[in-house]
């Protein structure tokens, strides 16, 4: 399953939002990958997410596979749409 998300918080995905994303992702057993501009990283890796350099306005594709993939995508989408509780 894949969900396209728009990074809309003011500073993009820096250390704190990356940690929040990984904390949510790690609650699920499914595999989660995040893709930006053709570069794909493990969605359960803070360093991987930060290496995407996803600033405000970046479009991400979040891929999840496994038995709880749909719930993982719903919760990750909610987190991103809430702007990582930064605003």
Enumerate the predicted regions with their spans.
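Absolute protein N-terminus
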Residues: 1-3
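Compact, glycine-rich, soluble single-domain proteins
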Residues: 6-47, 51-56, 73
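C-terminal structural segments of small proteins and small subunits
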Residues: 51-87
């Amino acid at each position: 399953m894949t969900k396209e998300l728009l990074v809309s918080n003011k500073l993009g995905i820096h250390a704190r939002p990356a940690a929040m994303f990984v904390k949510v992702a790690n609650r699920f057993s499914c595999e989660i990958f995040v893709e930006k501009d053709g570069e794909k990283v493990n969605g359960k890796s803070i360093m991987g997410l930060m290496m995407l350099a996803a600033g405000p306005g970046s479009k991400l594709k979040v891929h999840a596979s496994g038995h709880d993939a749909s719930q993982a995508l719903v919760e990750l989408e909610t987190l991103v749409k809430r702007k990582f509780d930064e605003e």
